[in-house]
Amino acid sequence: MTKPHKALLLLAFFTLLSTILMAQETGDERAEYLYEKEHPLRETRAVWLTTIGGLDWPRIKATDASSRERQKQELIRILDNYKRANINTVIFQTRVRAALLYPSKIEPWELSLTGKPGQSPGYDPLAFCIEECHKRGMELHSWVVCIPIGTQERQRGYGSASLVKKRPELVKTAKGGEMFMIPGKPETADYIASICKEIVENYDVDGISLDYIRYPESTYNFSDENLYPRASSMSKADWKRENITRIVRRVHDVVKAIKPWVKLSSSPIGKYRDTSRYSAGGWNAYNAVWQDPVYWLKENYQDLLFPMMYFQGNNYYPFLYQWAENSYGHPIVPGLGIYFLDPREGRWTLNEVRAEMHTARNSGIGGIAFYRGEFLTNNCKGIYDTTCDEFFPYPALTARMTWMGDTIAPQAPTSIKYEEGILHWQAPTQITQSNHSYLLYNIYGSNTYPVDVTKAENLLAVNLRDTQWQLNARAQKVRHYAVTAIDRLGNESPAVQEEKPVFELPKHINVPQLINRDVKGTKKTTTGKKTKKKKK
């Protein structure tokens, strides 16, 4: 895109935005008109499910069989609420502060599960969450916090199993007793990659999402510049960015070698760099914490980004546009700080969040993410109702991973039939690609035949793992159905179509008017009207 075209597009973007905001403030009905846009068939709809301190989950500590079951049920209720809102991606905090939510050979159990550091809850929460997400057609991305490992006190609680005891050379204590892994050491990249490798080898995760993949903010007075090679041709700033990129690259190489379809993402600072018109106020990814997520996308080290855009006004919209300009064909899914809807956290209004959601969708950059889950499911200022009714009334597919180079669609399913409220079909008879050996299925339905599988409003269910489906209430209202197969990279097959059987009389048969005898001297037609009986 040329500079003049960019300038015109930017001008149009901000003209539209200012019109929306003015109409919103004045209650002008034009705001609703400007918001109107078809619901997309493909859109990442994500929620960060935060486990540190049990912020979103778990509130119940698993100390015995009864509490363990209640902890599981608590998670099921959360996932059910996500499903009702047509969320399709759950970012599940798996590595918290050098402690994990699964049985590991590398790091200890996270204390939030039982209240005691290093203690097993008696089951595998990561495996359980994956299974429950997949039952509901949702992806699970394992959220890995990379650099911070918590306070000295927290680490002491893990004793000899702590990272501090096992790999002290990788850790440095900063201001306030906060401890961090050292980005300047290449072994740090290897260590974080080993965590991701363990997850991907042992679990059917759909993604690995790296969090805090950056240098600590300046308030911690953290420095590893003593490791900067004096003979380096790079500036110190570029050296720091390379240290962070090395971690991203190492994770990419390890994960993709095992399961190429696993989506790699991160949550960078919400402002990439200062724009030509707007300053990031000293807080951006590139210069403040030495992240270069745009480079990661360019090199395909990452499949998508979830930038933490917990801002308003000129701190949000110009930087959203900046991400859109620098996506290199990858989805950018802005993380919205809906926790600011809570009066204890901020003074955001629902309309402000709606404007951000509409603008993100209209920009076509890839989707929307919410931080964090509790504020969504608690319907803070009506955000859950708005999400369900206005933004996500239908399910959605996630983006195709076209940058992986394989865009060949699988063969269509076969032998579709409807029987007593259940839709059945057969898997494709031919496997044309290696990634087609494991397929999921999408269901579409409408009252017109054939079903148009390009329309979001016809999508009934996504990512089914079985070859049959019990029709839900919405599906029972339509007459025609279609099923597609979809592979791990998001390539979707042609549809196989079926018509729901409905009994209809042949058109050449004349049906006489039915007459019911009522009280003496009258007869009642099917319309319920009474007429006098004629005398003989």
Positions of PLM-derived features:
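Aromatic- and acidic-residue-enriched segments that line the glycan-binding/catalytic groove
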Residues: 100-115, 148-175, 213-232, 277-284
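Conserved aromatic anchor
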Residues: 421-435
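Glycoside hydrolase catalytic-domain groove-lining segments
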Residues: 230-278, 283-345
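Beta-strand-rich modules
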Residues: 469-492
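Extracellular fibronectin type III
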Residues: 486-516
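Catalytic domains of carbohydrate-active enzymes, especially glycoside hydrolases
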Residues: 70-99, 202-206
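Active-site-adjacent "subsite" loops/lids of carbohydrate-active enzymes
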Residues: 42-44, 50-73, 142, 147-202, ...
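Substrate-binding cleft of secreted/luminal carbohydrate-active enzymes
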Residues: 290-316, 330-404
